[in-house]
Amino acid sequence: MQDIQLDKRLSELLSQAVTPHNAQPLMQALCQSLNEHNIRYYVDDAPSITDSEYDRLMQRLKQLEAEYPQFVAADSPTQRVGGMALAKFEQITHLKPMLSLDNAFDEADFSAFHKRVSDRVGEVSFCCEPKLDGLAVSILYRNGVLERAATRGDGTVGEDITENVKTIKSIPLKLRGDNYPELVEVRGEAFMPKAAFEALNERARLKDEKLFVNPRNAAAGSLRQLDSKITASRALSFYAYALGVVEPTSHELAKTHYEQLQQLKSWGLPVSSEIKVCDELSQVFAYYQDILTRRSYLPFEIDGVVMKVNDIAQQQTLGFVAKSPRWAIAYKFPAQEEMTLLEGVDFQVGRTGAVTPVARLKPVFVGGVTVSNATLHNADEIERLGVMVGDTVIIRRAGDVIPQIVAIVPERRPEDAKAIAFPQHCPVCGSLVERLEGEAVTRCSGGLFCEAQRKEAIKHFASRKALDIDGMGDKIVEQLIDKELVQSPADLFKLPASMMTMLDRMGMKSATNLAQAIEAAKTTTLPRFLYALGIREVGEATASNLATHFGSLEALRVATIEQLIQVEDIGEVVAQHVAHFFAQPHNLEVIDALIAAGVNWPTIAAPSADEQPLKGQTWVLTGTLNQLNRNDAKAQLQALGAKVAGSVSKNTDCLVAGEAAGSKLAKAQELGVKVIGEDELLALLANS
């Protein structure tokens, strides 16, 4: 009801002509509305207006504040963008010390903590929450308005980071409602979500700037910027985890820690959705294992879970020791970062030909396992890290992610450290390795010839969208190669049925059927053949465009990059990949062997204008089609000259909407794009 009254009052004020007399109440109503919508978005996860509506209200407030600066409120959402840069941070003495937590590293440690607690206060339940890997922050609200914010510092004295904290969108500048204390201190963790961290490092990488090692360092560095505009650009977030000082002390608060967190949430403060109350020791251990299992999938970094006695009266009975509360403990996960020695580098060749440097490490226990290898990704990463053989390095292992080197320890570099040099030839097949301009990855040029790429190349060659060899599944391909019956795609067409009976669970009847399917696959189309070759960046549509444009394999084999760029939807990068593929003798040998084995296709006649009525049009498919599969529909539209895109835009000519069409249909309707159903599509294809 209050929300309806707020919206109604704002609508009334917005409908009036603005004068010096009504500007202030209008600005106050806009602030109140925008702050409420911020909380609905960041805390309740239930936005009630669109982003464009929010932006419109924000723009109106900015215009009014520019015209009437004397009425700018301290809790205005416009104040989040950051103000003047500071010369230094002022010191703040905490009203109540911000203590650290004792740690538990295994079940025995936590069981001992549980015994100490229950011996003092009897039966207990715990409020369990993820231990965020960020920066502890104290935020003070007076009469509901954010007054100041500080870092934890040494627990007694921290730094004033008020202006920086105001830029964090999930932190309300004014508390929601009116049932909060006159003065309330909120404690929580400021952190950088994983997605924001990746985006920050990507921007730094593009500018050739130093990268942050992990989200915790990024969050700490962002909060301690003297220029709050920099903090505002860093997409920090915040979760409240406790109440600090409350005045007057007579203000009624919830009786359990969990309920107090819900109280904070009702005031508009974000609280983790992963919090849970556990009544039994077994439930605590199950919670720990659950969060540990899901750790790598959470949107933020954590390094353990925090267990707090849930009952506030029991907390008060237990009290504190010098540096930590007796009623809480951090149950830490196995370390994800450790230091070790880089003893050497090996080079591996992946299924796509990527040559990847793999660091050989002095074995070290990290992330719950012993690690002796870590990826170095590519030459750019080696250069960025400045890493050499013999260096002491920091390695990181997060969940199921392959361990990686994230930094070196320069002061420990020995005098005989050696630079890491990429090989000039593929360590598997001996072909030249090459790195195309603009690419980070170095690749083997062996293509279809390279043993490291062989299995995946032949699986792709036989797949449904390529030569479509019925019955030639992945396991069959793997057996053929493991038993050395096949070394290149052309060898498939030389296999007699009798030889295929050597495969596991392959009788003569099955072998005969497979041999017949291989024989049938000899007759194909040029687009399918080109797609089957596995040229980088050449999918079905590109293969079709190449075949249509050049008309023959012979013409395509000798095409220059300049000629390739003339093909529809082919840019310089794809043109380089195609030209590079046909320049490799190994690949030409495989193609010649395939043709000698009898692989053939009909001659392509250049389509007339009448045969391509959709030329120049962009179509999009969405939803489930019942009578056509998506690939067939796409291929038939392309044959009629249409470009089939993956998303709807103002340039889309038509959307084909099947069953359960979602956001693409809504966007098409919003943009006024023509929409047809599957029946209309079938009629169009039948008449073309």
Curated annotation (Swiss-Prot):
Gene3D superfamilies: 5' to 3' exonuclease, C-terminal subdomain (1.10.150.20), 6.20.10.30, BRCT domain (3.40.50.10190), DNA ligase/mRNA capping enzyme (3.30.470.30), Helix hairpin bin (1.10.287.610), Nucleic acid-binding proteins (2.40.50.140). The keyword Acetylation does not apply. InterPro entries: BRCT_dom, BRCT_dom_sf, DisA/LigA_HHH, DNA_ligase, DNA_ligase_AS, DNA_ligase_CS, DNAligase_adenylation, DNAligase_N. One of its GO terms (biological process) is DNA replication. Its EC number is 6.5.1.2. Its cofactor is Mg(2+); Mn(2+). The active site is at K131. Zn(2+) binds at C426, C429, C444, C450. PROSITE patterns: BRCT (PS50172), DNA_LIGASE_N1 (PS01055), DNA_LIGASE_N2 (PS01056). It comes from the Bacteria. Keywords: DNA damage, DNA repair, DNA replication, Ligase, Magnesium, Manganese, Metal-binding, NAD, Zinc. It is an enzyme of class 6 (ligase). It catalyses: NAD(+) + (deoxyribonucleotide)n-3'-hydroxyl + 5'-phospho-(deoxyribonucleotide)m = (deoxyribonucleotide)n+m + AMP + beta-nicotinamide D-nucleotide. Pfam families: BRCT, DNA_ligase_aden, DNA_ligase_OB, DNA_ligase_ZBD, HHH_2. CDD domains: BRCT_DNA_ligase_like, LIGANc. The keyword ATP-binding does not apply. Residues 609-688 form the BRCT domain. NAD(+) binds at D51, S52, E53, Y54, D55, S100, L101, E129, R152, E189, K308, K332. GO terms for cellular component: cytosol. One of its GO terms (molecular function) is DNA binding. Belongs to the NAD-dependent DNA ligase family. LigA subfamily. DNA ligase that catalyzes the formation of phosphodiester linkages between 5'-phosphoryl and 3'-hydroxyl groups in double-stranded DNA using NAD as a coenzyme and as the energy source for the reaction. It is essential for DNA replication and repair of damaged DNA. This is DNA ligase. It comes from Shewanella sp. (strain MR-4). The gene is ligA.
